[in-house]
């Protein structure tokens, strides 16, 4: 166990409250002591950090230790506090994804979908709409970046080049099912074999899925993939097929449920505390109430006090809610920098809560560190299975709609090519480009507050170049 003093972290438990849920916990009295420490040591700068939302408690505490080590500095009167708000679901999600993917039925379905989709997109082993054979598929799946050459052939396929009948979707699906059945029988498989799928509402309380025949299931998944290509909402060939296969075969419940629970906790941390007391208080709101009092006291005394907000991955969601709560209920508070590291918040959330906060003077400056598109597509979540980054997985599987717009995805916020006609992406692009954007890898910029060379989504909050950049950023007032 980490022996980190409680002045360096605030642990948000179930429902975003102070209720204990693990080995580490925070009480309202601990937060009182934190602000007493700030006053007693005449702290002039406070960095508030939010780690990603799917990590476990131990990882959250490790992040708090990294922040303490890198940003707490007595000579400059700088203190750092980390919100440890773990859900611990990432290991569960990866374990379930990996377990399901090793299932023979899953692999069988995946291979048939690859064959049908590849043929419909007009490519094959050598291009020209040839059906990919089993040895080619299996060889590709053993690569770190499966079907990379095929992706290069497809590029950002325009809808006109995709074989998809938007005028008769029902008929197109029926024809796909016929084609699936024919292909399956040709390989001496049973097209009528039944497979459990995730058709029922995950919130309905019925853990059993529907049973679909192999042929019908393959057709439904191929239909979903081809529709995403036609509507230009795909995440390239193999990741899209994997996403849609998981959406149909049961396992996406784990990811969507975990992600939804995490977002709910990020919201509840800053819910109203009226009528609550003790450990039932919402940790974020209680923290803000004391932060506002401390900020006003420093202001009235003519003393310096700058507040810096830094959020990694889903920590950006918590910060969006913190900014909204500040705007509505703690209007005397003003922040200096808001720094996002590979943010996993939806663009519409930031447009609704983050942009207005800056326009209204709640914070002065914004900076985002994230990966270039080509690096994002080399950061595999699950090796040999989901070969793009966590942000793509969130966009393609964890949100309700496919290709949900996520703020840290370079391919999306560039608002170019197939993303050029999305109004929300134009809005987010305009905001990002009018502020500061650091893309990995960049360690040659003349401005050393823009350096980053993180090539993994999870590394931004412990990447030396990025940490030094944040330090340079918050020291520029």
PLM region descriptions:
Residues 44-53:
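Short beta-strand element of the alpha/beta-hydrolase
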Residues 75-89:
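Conserved alpha/beta-hydrolase
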Residues 54-60:
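Short substrate-entry loop that stabilizes the transition state in hydrolases
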Residues 1-26, 87-163, 189, 195-306, ...:
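Lipolytic serine-hydrolase domain surface
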Residues 62-78:
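Short amphipathic alpha-helix adjacent to the substrate-entry channel of hydrolases
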Residues 309-315, 319:
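Gly/Ala-rich beta-loop-alpha elbow adjacent to hydrolase catalytic centers
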Residues 22-38:
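A short loop-to-beta-strand scaffold at the N-terminal edge of the catalytic core in hydrolase folds
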Residues 37-45:
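Proline/glycine-enriched tight loop/beta-turn segments at coil->beta junctions
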């Amino acid at each position: 166990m980490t022996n980190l003093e409680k002045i360096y972290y605030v642990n948000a438990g179930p429902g975003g409250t102070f209720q204990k849920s693990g080995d580490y916990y925070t009480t309202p009295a601990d937060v009182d002591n934190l602000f007493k420490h700030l006053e007693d040591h005449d702290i002039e700068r406070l960095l508030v950090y939010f780690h990603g939302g799917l990590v476990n408690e131990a990882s959250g505490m490790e992040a708090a230790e990294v922040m303490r080590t890198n940003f707490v500095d007595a000579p400059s009167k700088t203190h750092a506090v980390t919100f440890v708000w773990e859900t611990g679901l990432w290991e569960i999600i990866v374990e379930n994804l990996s377990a399901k993917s090793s299932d023979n039925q899953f692999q069988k379905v995946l291979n048939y979908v690859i064959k049908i989709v590849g043929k419909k997109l007009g490519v094959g082993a050598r291009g020209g709409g040839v059906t990919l054979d089993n040895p080619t598929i299996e060889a590709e799946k053993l690569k770190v970046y499966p079907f990379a050459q095929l992706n290069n052939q497809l590029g950002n396929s325009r809808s006109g080049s995709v074989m998809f009948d938007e005028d008769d979707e029902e008929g197109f699906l029926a024809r796909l099912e016929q084609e699936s059945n024919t292909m399956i029988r040709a390989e001496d498989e049973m097209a009528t074999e039944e497979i459990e799928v995730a058709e029922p509402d995950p919130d309905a309380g019925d853990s059993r899925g529907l049973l679909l025949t192999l042929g019908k299931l393959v057709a439904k998944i191929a239909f979903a993939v081809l529709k995403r290509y036609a509507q230009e909402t795909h995440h390239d060939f193999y990741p899209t097929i994997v996403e849609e296969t998981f959406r149909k075969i049961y396992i996406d419940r784990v990811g969507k449920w975990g992600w939804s629970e995490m977002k709910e906790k990020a919201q509840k941390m800053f819910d109203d505390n009226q009528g609550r007391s003790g450990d039932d208080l919402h940790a974020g709101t209680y923290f803000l109430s004391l932060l506002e009092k401390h900020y006003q006291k420093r202001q009235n005394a003519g003393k310096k006090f700058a507040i810096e907000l830094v959020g990694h991955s889903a920590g950006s969601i918590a910060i969006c809610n913190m900014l909204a709560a500040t705007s509505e209920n703690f209007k005397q508070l003003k922040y200096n920098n808001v720094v996002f590291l590979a943010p996993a918040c939806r663009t519409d959330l930031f447009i609704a809560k983050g942009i207005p906060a800056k326009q209204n003077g709640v914070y002065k400056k914004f900076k985002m560190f994230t990966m270039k598109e080509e690096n994002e597509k080399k950061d595999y979540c699950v090796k040999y299975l989901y070969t793009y980054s966590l942000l793509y997985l969130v966009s393609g599987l964890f949100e309700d709609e496919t290709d949900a717009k996520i703020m840290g995805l370079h391919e999306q916020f560039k608002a170019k090519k197939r993303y050029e006609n999305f109004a929300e992406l134009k809005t987010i692009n305009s905001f990002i480009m009018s502020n500061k954007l650091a893309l990995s890898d960049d360690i040659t910029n003349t401005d050393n507050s823009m350096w980053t060379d993180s090539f993994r989504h999870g590394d931004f909050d412990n990447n030396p170049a990025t940490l030094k950049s944040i330090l340079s950023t918050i020291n520029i007032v």
